[in-house]
């Protein structure tokens, strides 16, 4: 696994984007709901930037909103992590 998915927050972002595209604020709200705490915008957008720079997430503009989606590479990495995690839990 590359270092870009070693962060729990980045993995969670990829998991939330699996199968759907989300506006940044909706994505941030879902993460905050899952974590049970507020996420600093700088931290959230920093994680998105790393994922986009590494080719795991792509952005498109829809009106005035940025919409994020998982790329094929991001989906592959997420499935690799899921497979690894499943193997660990079966042991």
Question: Can you describe what each PLM-predicted range is?
Answer:
Residues 9-14, 44:
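Short alpha-helical "packing" element that flanks the helix-turn-helix/winged-helix DNA-binding module
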Residues 52-60:
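A short, conserved structural fragment
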Residues 7, 61-67:
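Short, Lys/Arg-rich nucleic-acid/phosphate-binding segment
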Residues 25-36:
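DNA-recognition alpha helix
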Residues 45-50:
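Short, hydrophobic-biased segments on the C-terminal half of alpha helices
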């Amino acid at each position: 696994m590359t270092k870009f998915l070693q962060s729990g927050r980045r993995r969670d972002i990829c998991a939330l984007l699996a199968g759907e595209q989300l506006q940044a604020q909706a994505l941030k709200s879902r993460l905050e709901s899952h974590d049970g705490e507020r996420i600093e915008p700088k931290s959230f957008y920093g994680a998105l930037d790393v994922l986009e720079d590494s080719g795991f997430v792509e952005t498109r503009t829809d009106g005035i909103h940025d919409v994020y989606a998982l790329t094929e590479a991001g989906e592959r990495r997420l499935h690799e992590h899921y497979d690894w995690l499943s193997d660990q839990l079966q042991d």
